[in-house]
């Protein structure tokens, strides 16, 4: 990111002059080196293409047909549930069965997987167990082909994008062919995965923005509005498929900010026009993606109205509206003597849980109290008053009111909800929470005062109700408040979330808010929660996204165990650790996620060299060398910053992530890198090989890429013979194609 900012500041002045010249319609002329010996650089096309003729359509069609072959050839050869088909196939089933689930990714791409299953006639009964053969009634070939069509589209999208960026036809064809002949892009489009839709929508976003820039000189025209709106639509689709789409939003956001700042500095643009430019981009690039993203989650909730495996991740109010949910089938009232479960209003914590076997390792032998996601029998507490007699569900009804002092007795262990003098294990403030004492030894340390914060039902505030009442619990002796955290305890605490008692000045947060999720009390009748609880789309969308983020952050690599599928970001551009996708048994149809080495290494070289090129030419320009015709360096920067910036923004953030990473996370960045490679070849060919026909240069590059693709194609289309026969394809010793010192 720092490199991006440095390059932006270095070229901002040049770009502003270029835009101002265009606004004032200044003429341009060729320039030569001050010594008279240097030939001025130029980009082969003078203007960006804003329309497609018949030849462009024919070339795009030919590329599409070739893409269809590479993505669909023998796609049903492996009739076994392979790799992450286990997850995404089963997630698709949830939509067919309408049962709620939880995952780390937004739902759009999984909805498309579900659509493929529905169109193929599935009834949602197949569980997609890893390694099991597909039964006859599952048309897995259709499902894979449906998903593969998104991978097919990125090839013609690449051609169209390059034409809008000013590539000549030969080099636009070359760029699309690079995308066509990359083995990793191809193989990841051939299974029931999310990568193909993600790549398709990423390519669509780049295409839309490139087309929009081609109409930059025609502001507020029909085509200008169409492509600006289509950019927002594409950004909404890509971020609704995977959060990697946020990098595409960041790219368009940075470039849009730069453009608006340049327009702001242009004296020829009136203030009213400035406001129109800002308003158009707010509507199309912020509002449209936000509406699409929220709408996708609204559809997600509508399609999954039945209780499922993931409902425990959602707040109690959401669960109360799910069909077949235990939260919806209980009383609304609660009183002393009721058995209750306590849920935090902090996403990621869950319910307060106690287990007799979970103990602190520092000599304190009290039971750990922590947050757990699922509903378990050790989550239940008896709500009792300060009287010496412990109430139960046969006692006279006495409701819990705001300001009451209460105790919580855990009948599973015979202990009380209690705080003490010890510091929490992870959190650096507050007091430790534990289950202490016994059924005959209550203490002031387990006496809590109820502070009702809000009531989300039509019932009057001031009394405790199930699901709808949010409240705080303040310890009567210490004055600290019961507070949830998302800090996980070590393995001795089963990775559960730590529970603490925070000082009073730390309690005005959602983490100190609680509600009763379930109640057991035969004194009360079952309530109709559909009349008591409101549907809150925005709240549920924010909640589920926070849960997704927390789950995603907890997907960390285990440093004590080697996993052949994992790899670090620094290794991706150099293709050091390709990935086995399936079993490597001799009779298994084997697939290897290895990219086209020629394309990966060449594109990496271009991505590393591009900032150095810009720095070199800027330094020469400061020394009064005229290596470029007027406006040409800015055009080189305009196109290069879009492609290089896309690569950098889709790649470099992975170095900051703590979660486990895989080589397929690099594929969106690779798409930008391949187009940048083609752009560099076009520029270098025009500068240093002007006498060689462009089609000849493009044909040589495409032939080389195609030959390497064919060489590795057995690993892309499936290899069902002993892998030793392909030992010659292990180009690097780090590859685990043929030899690997670890068992898989």
Residue ranges with predicted function:
Residues 77-90, 100-115, 122-126, 138-141:
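Extracytoplasmic catalytic/substrate-binding loops of multi-pass membrane glycan-assembly enzymes
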Residues 82-83, 184-198, 241-244:
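Short acidic/glycine- and proline-prone juxtamembrane loop motifs at membrane-interface regions
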Residues 141, 145-166, 204:
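Transmembrane-helix motifs of polytopic, lipid-linked glycan transferases
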Residues 164-166, 205-226, 257-262, 681:
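Membrane-interface transmembrane helices that cradle and orient dolichyl/undecaprenyl
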Residues 176, 222, 226-241:
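Membrane-interface alpha helices of multi-pass inner-membrane proteins
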